[in-house]
């Protein structure tokens, strides 16, 4: 299965900014991990006879395995895919206890960027073991459309922001033609930018702010590729103001100090020159 832009953006966040997954894990599994909890990123390539399968993410937090898949469509085979992924993850992390093996399935969930009335809250499989015991395999789903701008920031689910435009996907063309709808969308994104600035105003978070901005614009450009007005409007709001990095701030202050010192030096030099000139004039 080929990657989509949504896969690429999601995996970029998981690989480069894995701490963004922590609030999402807390939301789904009702945990309370702090944002700075140590995270171990496990490999997401698993070999099988007819090639390799690639999962979107596999993280280890506090000794537990977490697996998150990002879906841009409501795939009815997703339950089978998930148990296949989870089985490979469990096997690769199997624990040998004498002649017995223990495999722990990861806590998994699926993030649906697009969903409908038939998208389930849980993916389910009923497994019948050789001894006739029945095991119920259940994976919770997260639906982007159920999260508003306010709830995203309240729960710190910043990982959802790049995909936020997809909540309005069906209305993009109309927004391009309707000034009022278009302005409402711009106001919405102005609030997103403002909230991001407030939450990531520290110099240590400036890089995260800029990276999220880039990903927000990347997905918006893709979704709005045929609607130039909307695409440009979001780009100007999100890309129009970039927080200053600490290194940039120090460089700016250095240049300002040098310019000020030069100006003062020139002024003092001029005053001294004038004074010397007057003294010479008196002697003559």
Where are these regions (language model features)?
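Arginine residue identity/basic-tract feature
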Residues: 11, 43, 81, 99-102, ...
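Short amphipathic alpha-helical signal-transduction/dimerization elements
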Residues: 86, 90-93, 169, 220-224, ...
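Coupling/switch segment of ABC-type P-loop NTPase heads
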Residues: 153-180
């Amino acid at each position: 299965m080929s990657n989509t832009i949504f896969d690429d953006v999601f995996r970029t966040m998981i690989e480069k900014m894995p701490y963004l997954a922590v609030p999402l894990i807390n939301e789904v599994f009702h945990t309370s991990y702090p944002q700075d909890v140590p995270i171990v990123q496990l490999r997401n390539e698993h070999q099988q006879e007819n090639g390799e399968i690639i999962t979107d993410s596999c993280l280890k937090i506090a000794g537990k395995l977490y697996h998150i898949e990002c879906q841009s469509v409501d795939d009815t085979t997703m339950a089978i895919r998930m148990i296949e992924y989870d089985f490979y993850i469990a096997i690769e992390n199997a624990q040998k206890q004498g002649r017995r093996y223990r495999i722990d399935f990861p806590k998994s969930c699926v993030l649906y960027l697009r969903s409908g009335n038939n998208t389930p809250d849980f993916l389910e499989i009923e497994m019948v073991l050789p001894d006739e015991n029945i095991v119920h395999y259940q994976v919770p789903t997260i639906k982007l459309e159920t999260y508003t701008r306010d709830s995203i920031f309240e729960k710190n689910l910043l990982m959802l922001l790049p995909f936020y435009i997809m909540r309005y996907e069906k209305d993009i063309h109309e927004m391009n033609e309707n000034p009022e709808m278009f302005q409402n969308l711009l106001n919405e994104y102005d609030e997103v930018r403002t909230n991001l600035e407030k939450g990531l105003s520290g110099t240590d978070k400036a890089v995260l702010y800029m990276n999220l901005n880039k990903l927000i614009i990347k997905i918006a450009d893709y979704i709005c590729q045929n609607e130039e007005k909307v695409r440009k409007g979001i780009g100007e709001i999100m890309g129009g103001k970039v927080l200053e990095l600490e290194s940039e701030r120090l460089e700016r202050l250095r240049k300002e100090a040098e310019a000020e010192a030069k100006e003062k030096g020139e002024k003092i030099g001029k005053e001294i020159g004038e004074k010397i000139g007057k003294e010479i004039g008196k002697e003559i």
